[in-house]
């Protein structure tokens, strides 16, 4: 786009065209005739171009879901910023954490969810960690697909937390004296 007009051609190693593509769920080629309708054209095809609009959608959808269940999100601005950049059309969903993992320290649970999976932690009104997590899928709302997406994310989290549980239990089974003895052999 040069001076508000769509420019087609080639410059060095780049080809300039007058088309782009919709969200992967639509998988459609979109012809752009003028810049005035570019953003709306993308939104109509499930690509929210404006980062602030994507962020607002995530925040509003999150508030709606959590208020319904009287829950709170653990505030994590940097994770929100990261997730906003990972999705074109945010779909906020809530999954469940298997009860067996709730015995892990809060820091272990939240780190696994945040760092490895980009999931948000959820608490009750007293800030106790809930056996639920919130995540943002890159898809349109669809009850059947959302159900499968939630199930899939729950399975992935179960595997991650199983690993965390193994390492945590292994670590606490050793005393500091044991660890110090093992460290004597490290150069």
PLM feature segments, named:
Residues 1-187:
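Amphipathic alpha-helical "coupling" segments that flank catalytic cores
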């Amino acid at each position: 786009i040069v001076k508000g007009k769509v420019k087609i051609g080639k410059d060095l190693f780049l080809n300039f065209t007058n088309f782009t593509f919709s969200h992967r769920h639509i998988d459609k080629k979109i012809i752009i005739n003028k810049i005035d309708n570019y953003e709306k054209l993308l939104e109509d095809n499930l690509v929210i171009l404006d980062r602030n609009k994507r962020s607002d959608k995530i925040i509003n959808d999150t508030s709606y879901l959590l208020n319904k269940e009287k829950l709170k999100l653990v505030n994590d601005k940097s994770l929100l910023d990261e997730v906003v950049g990972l999705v074109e059309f945010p779909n906020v969903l809530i999954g469940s954490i298997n009860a067996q993992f709730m015995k892990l320290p809060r820091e272990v649970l939240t780190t696994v969810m945040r760092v490895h999976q980009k999931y948000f932690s959820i608490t009750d009104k007293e800030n106790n960690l809930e056996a639920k997590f919130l995540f943002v899928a890159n898809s349109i709302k669809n009850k059947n697909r959302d159900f499968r997406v939630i199930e899939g994310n729950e399975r992935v989290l179960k595997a991650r937390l199983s690993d965390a549980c193994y390492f945590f239990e292994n670590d606490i089974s050793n005393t500091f004296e044991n660890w110090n003895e093992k460290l004597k052999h490290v150069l």
